[in-house]
UniProtKB/Swiss-Prot annotation:
Gene3D superfamilies: Cytidine Deaminase, domain 2 (3.40.140.10). GO terms for biological process: formation of cytoplasmic translation initiation complex. This is Eukaryotic translation initiation factor 3 subunit H. Keywords: Cytoplasm, Initiation factor, Protein biosynthesis. It comes from Bombyx mori. Its main location: cytoplasm. Component of the eukaryotic translation initiation factor 3 (eIF-3) complex. Component of the eukaryotic translation initiation factor 3 (eIF-3) complex, which is involved in protein synthesis of a specialized repertoire of mRNAs and, together with other initiation factors, stimulates binding of mRNA and methionyl-tRNAi to the 40S ribosome. The eIF-3 complex specifically targets and initiates translation of a subset of mRNAs involved in cell proliferation.
């Protein structure tokens, strides 16, 4: 993914002025179709390019096309350029304005996504990444969100320093890696009329499954993913604690060595002997490499996302349960009367 932004036009590195994203209904339908097809084929994520243009303070997404599956025999950049040339021939907006990716229950944060968006945003100033939640949309909640990297995240990637001190100086955490850009879906007036007519044609009983309680599999999947991320974060914490213990032990050894050398030099000076040479302490005690903290930060963000979704899901399920119980009690009371 990181190399796919290389062929795009380079923009000046000033702060973008994009206030919101306007996505055509055609592009949304193509994104939805591609993501659902790939989710049925057991592919982890579906990805594609977004095409459009920038008009004043909005980014218009007018078309898109999917990226091919990973194949060593195919040049991805050449494929992308060829697709843009073909779209240009048929008078379709061919300017690259970002990319899209599918997500699993809102959890899209990953190292590969951060790296890809960094390369896109440094090559194309206005670029965004559009995240489509396949599973949540399949339950009736269209989830389409646009994100951009924050200035702190871009500075972090430019410096390439992921130590705790560097992240603390940048005041960056998983909460401010991305900034969400409002996204609106635009349809032509004729399309809106047709949607209104189709809505009236749907029977009332078809849209009344709001009290469906068969959601155990969804909650089970989220809890299983949450447990995996907690285990991963625990392993990262163990690694960092081990590093801190090594640093403390090394500092103690260094202090003992310096005290011993000072005592030896004092004894030699009392005997009018030449003192021992002062050796470089850092050569004797080489500092341990600091484990990078970027991956633990991302895992913590994934845990936070899963926790929020589980909390929201349980609240909705409890509300459904109480409503269903009230309706059942009313039905039984009516039958008894």
């Amino acid at each position: 993914m990181a190399s796919r932004a290389g062929s795009a036009r380079r923009a000046p590195e000033n702060e973008a002025t994009i206030q919101y994203v306007q996505c055509d209904g055609l592009a949304v339908m193509k994104i939805v179709k591609h993501c659902h097809e790939e989710s049925c084929s057991n592919m982890e994520v579906a990805q594609g390019a977004l095409l459009g243009l920038v008009v004043e303070n909005r980014l218009e997404i007018t078309n898109c096309f999917p990226f091919p599956k990973h194949d060593d025999t195919m040049d991805e950049e050449e494929y992308q350029l060829d697709m843009m040339r073909r779209l240009r021939r048929v008078n379709v907006d061919h300017f690259h304005v970002g990319w899209y990716q599918s997500a699993d229950v809102g959890n899209f944060l990953s190292l590969s996504l951060l790296e890809s968006q960094y390369h896109y945003q440094t090559s194309i100033e206005e670029s965004v990444v559009v995240i489509y939640d396949t599973k949540k949309s399949a339950r009736g909640f269209l989830t389409l969100k646009a994100y951009r990297l924050t200035p702190q995240a871009i500075a972090m990637y430019k410096e390439g320093d992921y130590t705790p001190e560097a992240l603390r100086n940048l005041k960056i955490g998983y909460e401010n890696l991305f900034i969400e850009v409002p996204i609106v879906i635009r349809n032509s007036p004729l399309t809106n009329i047709m949607i209104s007519e189709l809505t009236e044609m749907i029977p009332e009983e078809e849209g009344s499954k709001f009290l469906d309680l068969g959601t155990a599999s969804v909650l089970e999947g989220q809890l299983r993913s949450l447990m995996e991320r907690v285990d991963e974060l625990n392993q990262e914490a163990i690694k960092f604690n081990r590093y801190q213990q090594l640093v403390v032990r090394q500092q103690q050894d260094k202090h003992r060595w310096m005290v011993k050398r000072a005592q030896e030099n004092a004894a030699r000076a009392a005997k009018d002997e030449t003192p021992l040479p002062e050796e470089d302490v850092n050569k004797l005690f080489k500092p341990h490499p600091v484990p990078p903290r970027l991956n633990p930060m991302i895992v913590a963000g994934q845990i936070d996302t899963y926790s929020q979704h589980i909390s929201q899901f349980c609240s909705q399920s409890l509300a459904k349960l109480y409503l269903t119980q009230a309706l059942q009690n009313a039905k039984e009371a009516k039958q008894n009367n």
